[in-house]
Swiss-Prot record:
Functional summary from the UniProt entry: Involved in oxygen transport from the lung to the various peripheral tissues.
Entries under PANTHER family matching the protein: HEMOGLOBIN FAMILY MEMBER (PTHR11442), HEMOGLOBIN SUBUNIT ALPHA (PTHR11442:SF48)
Positions of heme b binding: 87
Modified residues (N6-acetyllysine): 16
Complexes and interactors: Heterotetramer of two alpha chains and two beta chains.
CDD domains: Hb-alpha-like
InterPro entries per UniProt: Globin (IPR000971), Globin-like_sf (IPR009050), Globin/Proto (IPR012292), Hemoglobin_a-typ (IPR002338), Hemoglobin_oxygen_transport (IPR050056), Hemoglobin_pi (IPR002339)
Sites bearing Phosphothreonine, chain numbering: 8, 108, 134, 137
Gene name per UniProt: HBA
Protein name listed in UniProt: Hemoglobin subunit alpha
Natural source organism: Pteronura brasiliensis
Residues recorded with modification Phosphoserine: 3, 35, 49, 102, 124, 138
Length: 141
């Protein structure tokens, strides 16, 4: 459960990211593919080379979904319901991949905002991404 302090940290961090969310989403996705090659299996139709426009575009979709989640932290199941359905029933993404991408998002944010990435912010973002992952995989059961 996200505490009020966690929510404040997440919102403040997302505000600082601003217009870079899409860029960071693409970078995190690239990092995920490089670090965990098995995640590429869900994107056989993509050009997965570094700097690929398709990876950047999908990274922006990830970032947009997270921006929506930040705006609706008090009701994530409703905010992410359609996305959960898509990943569970149509795309059938292995739930572990959300954890892998979450880790790469944390690394990407830490690289770009080291001064703001305090232990408290790190913990809050980790809890937030974990909560989002749990919601996205809730319909797998």
């Amino acid at each position: 459960v996200l505490s009020p302090a966690d929510k404040t940290n997440v919102k403040a961090t997302w505000d600082k990211i601003g217009g870079h969310a899409g860029e960071y989403g693409g970078e995190a996705l690239e990092r995920t593919f490089a670090s965990f090659p098995t995640t590429k299996t869900y994107f056989p139709h993509f050009d997965l080379s570094p700097g690929s426009a398709q990876v950047k575009a999908h990274g922006k979709k990830v970032a947009d979904a997270l921006t929506n989640a930040v705006a609706h932290m008090d009701d994530l199941p409703a905010a992410l319901s359609a996305l959960s359905d898509l990943h569970a029933y149509k795309l059938r993404v292995d739930p572990v991949n959300f954890k892998l991408l979450s880790h790469c998002l944390l690394v990407t944010l830490a690289c770009h905002h080291p001064a703001e990435f305090t232990p408290a912010v790190h913990a809050s973002l980790d809890k937030f991404f974990s909560t989002v992952s749990t919601v996205l995989t809730s319909k797998y059961r």
